[in-house]
């Protein structure tokens, strides 16, 4: 009788229109119900029946009404769906195809699915990894959720899954770009390449490196200064801005480095062969010569030129470090000529490092964590590699080269691809002064730390403090590093200018700078200048690559450390973040990140306080842990599905002593 009654429908609509509405995000729970989060302090309960219309993370408009004496939200209108393209796993439900999203909050969802036209059902089995797209949503007028599978990533039990799934998740390629049959040299007709094959350049890289893009030569003068020459591989000799390969390089932005494998920005035949500075092979290069004083000051005689060079020795970091640090290396014995060059390069690097320590900012030494994998993609070991003397030698050479490029591009064109950093966020400067200089006895003022020199002085001061607590606090108040086409300073390095050009095989921004440096050499207008979008594009690529690297690492850590909770293995954790729920620590033995919930420190909310603003954890108002502290921990849980680690301290905090009464005192 009441079905399809227009008057009833109109009445219902009027009632709904008069009810208050709120906009917010959906937060799902494991129990079927959820919440509409309007802001950090306001949320409304969503009963299970209404939750069936939405997904965790959806942005919606909901009607707020009272049911059973409780305010509840009924989602009505979809503003933005949280799930569009996503990664999931195949689940067969009563013989029908479903997909379960690979997301911690969505793993209880099983969404009905179909295959995109052209995909074969026989290729899909329970647990297989797929790319799917949400094509129907109840808040869009559809009856139910429905997804379309657009591609299969890999089989359920494939050990390569961490890499392929993560790359698909971030919409990144999983292979190198296709090469071409014949690469041709496309130099400007006026570009003269100086014949420098007789100069004994050396390359220093990892033992397995194939894309060697920098070669070095140094000569110490009678006065004790250093004449440094840096030669960099020249892929822009083969790729012009109009080439299809240039578009591919720009779309990729960088070579992707993941644990155990990389995906090159350029085809391997170019990156690992034609442009790689292989020992004994003649290669086109862009070179820079500069004099660096014995005090580490970069001279004004910076000169860029094109050349044909030949590497005279392909050296490895560890062998060179052993030789420099111990006087010999079991694996490598240099000729007298190469020994002199390496020694001069090393002395140059010490002079530059000392200058930077006094006048700029030197980042603290932290290990690089490296996964050693078997052919079957199992983790054999996790190595903590410290940066040694040969690594620092190359690093100082590259920093010097990039300062030279920055100065040259600023002077000649007032543009280029610059790495910049703005120091502290302006709104946080007063807070930083209060933190480091509460009594006003130190040199740091709001005016001084807003300048490059003052910020660098602050970072140098923080580096020599007894603990890293203040350093960790202040890092949160810093701006992010950026890439842009304006010649702005790099506060975090303490440098007034910085433009990278030393990795053109691996970075698209370096290819642009190569073209601009060639314009300097030719005294012409550049064939390519960086547009206003390129910096944002590169920053976005870098962000996705870092997320991918972290996700693969988390997956491998969860695999590798799965048995540690039962073994109760002790690790050393360094606290790098504190929020109201607990602390995040880095395991110094292997680089894994783990979360310590407050309840696993002390299961008493009245007594424990985790304060994210101050970066402290207190028990009974007394600070027991703070940012930068190291503590002994054991793993309490390794969640393979979510790829997350939960840890707890080995230190046990006692129950609160019973309050003493007059009677107990007199008895004593």
From Swiss-Prot:
Q: Where in the cell is it found?
A: Cytoplasm
Return the Pfam families for the record. Answer: OB_RNB, RNB, S1
Q: Which residues form the S1 motif domain?
A: 568-650
Principal EC category:
hydrolase
Q: Name one GO molecular function term.
A: exoribonuclease II activity
Q: Which Gene3D superfamilies match?
A: 2.40.50.640, Nucleic acid-binding proteins
**Reactions that this protein is recorded to catalyse:** Exonucleolytic cleavage in the 3'- to 5'-direction to yield nucleoside 5'-phosphates
Q: Which GO terms of the cellular component aspect does the record hold? A: cytosol
EC number(s) on file: 3.1.13.1
Its keywords, alphabetically, are:
Cytoplasm, Exonuclease, Hydrolase, Nuclease, RNA-binding
Residues in domain RNB? Answer: 193-521
Q: Name one GO biological process term.
A: mRNA catabolic process
**InterPro entries under this entry?**
CSD (IPR011129), NA-bd_OB-fold (IPR012340), RNase_B_OB_dom (IPR013223), RNase_II (IPR011804), RNase_II/R (IPR001900), RNase_II/R_CS (IPR022966), RNase_II/RNase_R (IPR004476), RNR_Ribonuclease (IPR050180)
**Which NCBIfam families does this one have?**
3_prime_RNase (TIGR00358), PRK05054.1 (NF003455), RNase_B (TIGR02062)
Please give the family membership noted in the entry: Belongs to the RNR ribonuclease family. RNase II subfamily.
Q: Which PANTHER family match?
A: EXORIBONUCLEASE 2 (PTHR23355:SF37), RIBONUCLEASE (PTHR23355)
* Role description: Involved in mRNA degradation. Hydrolyzes single-stranded polyribonucleotides processively in the 3' to 5' direction.
Query: Which protein is depicted?
Result: Exoribonuclease 2
Native species: Vibrio parahaemolyticus serotype O3:K6 (strain RIMD 2210633)
Q: Which gene encodes it?
A: rnb
């Amino acid at each position: 009788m009441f079905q399809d009654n227009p008057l009833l429908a109109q009445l219902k609509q009027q009632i709904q229109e008069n009810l208050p509405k709120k906009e917010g995000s959906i937060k799902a729970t494991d129990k079927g119900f959820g919440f509409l989060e309007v802001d950090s302090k306001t949320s409304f309960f969503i009963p299970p029946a209404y939750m069936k219309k939405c997904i965790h993370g959806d942005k919606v408009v909901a009607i707020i009404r009272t049911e059973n004496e409780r305010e509840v939200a009924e989602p009505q209108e979809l503003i933005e769906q949280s799930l569009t393209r996503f990664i999931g796993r195949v689940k067969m439900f009563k013989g029908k195809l479903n997909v379960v999203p690979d997301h911690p909050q969505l793993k209880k969802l099983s969404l009905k699915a179909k295959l995109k036209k052209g995909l074969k059902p026989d290729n899909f089995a329970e647990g297989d990894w797929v790319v799917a797209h949400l094509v129907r949503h109840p808040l869009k007028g559809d009856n139910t959720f429905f997804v379309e599978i657009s591609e299969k990533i890999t089989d359920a039990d494939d050990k390569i899954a961490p890499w392929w799934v993560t790359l698909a998740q971030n919409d990144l390629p999983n292979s190198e770009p296709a090469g071409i049959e014949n690469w041709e040299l496309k130099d400007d007709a006026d570009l003269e390449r100086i014949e420098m094959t007789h100069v004994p350049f050396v390359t220093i890289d990892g033992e397995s490196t194939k894309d060697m893009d920098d070669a070095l030569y140094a000569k110490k003068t009678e006065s004790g200064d250093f004449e440094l020459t840096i030669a960099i591989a020249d892929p822009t000799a083969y790729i012009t801005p109009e080439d299809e390969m240039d578009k591919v390089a720009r779309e990729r932005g960088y070579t992707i480095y993941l644990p155990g494998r990389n995906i090159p920005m350029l085809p391997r035949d170019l990156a690992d062969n034609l442009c790689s500075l292989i020992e004994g092979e003649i290669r086109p290069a862009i070179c820079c010569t500069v004099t660096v004083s014995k005090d580490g000051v970069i001279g004004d005689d910076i000169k860029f030129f094109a050349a044909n060079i030949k590497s005279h020795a392909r050296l490895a970091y560890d062998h060179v470090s052993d030789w420099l640090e111990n006087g010999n290396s079991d694996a490598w014995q240099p000729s007298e000529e190469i020994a002199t060059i390496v020694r001069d390069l090393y002395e140059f690097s010490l002079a530059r490092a000392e200058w930077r320590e006094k006048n700029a900012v030197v980042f603290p030494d932290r290990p690089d964590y490296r996964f050693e994998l078997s052919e079957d993609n199992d983790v054999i070991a996790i190595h903590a590699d410290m940066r040694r003397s040969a690594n620092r030698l190359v690093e100082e050479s590259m920093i010097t080269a990039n300062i030279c490029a920055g100065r040259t591009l600023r002077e000649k064109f007032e543009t280029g691809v610059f790495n910049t950093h703005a120091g502290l966020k302006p709104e946080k400067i007063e807070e930083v002064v209060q933190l480091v200089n509460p009594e006003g006895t130190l040199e740091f003022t709001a005016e001084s730390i807003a300048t490059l020199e003052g910020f660098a002085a602050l970072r140098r001061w923080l580096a020599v403090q007894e603990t890293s607590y203040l350093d960790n606090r202040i890092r949160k108040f810093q701006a992010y590093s950026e890439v842009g086409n304006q010649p702005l300073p790099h506060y975090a390095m303490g440098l007034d200018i910085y433009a990278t050009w030393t990795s053109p095989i691996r970075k698209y921004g370096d290819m642009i700078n190569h073209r601009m440096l060639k314009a300097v050499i030719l005294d012409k207008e550049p064939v390519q200048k960086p547009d206003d979008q390129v910096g944002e594009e590169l920053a976005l690529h870098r962000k996705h690559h870092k997320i991918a690297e972290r996700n693969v690492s988390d997956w491998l850590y969860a695999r590798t450390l799965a048995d540690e909770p039962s073994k109760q293995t002790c690790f050393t954790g360094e606290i790098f973040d504190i929020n109201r729920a607990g602390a995040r620590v880095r395991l110094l033995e292997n680089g894994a990140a783990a979360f310590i919930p407050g309840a696993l420190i002390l299961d008493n909310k009245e007594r424990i306080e985790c304060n994210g603003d101050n970066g402290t954890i207190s028990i009974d108002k007394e600070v027991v842990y703070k940012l930068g502290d190291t503590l002994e921990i054991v793993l309490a849980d390794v969640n393979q599905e979510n790829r997350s680690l939960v840890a707890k301290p080995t230190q046990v905090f006692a129950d609160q002593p019973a309050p003493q009464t007059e009677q107990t005192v007199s008895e004593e």
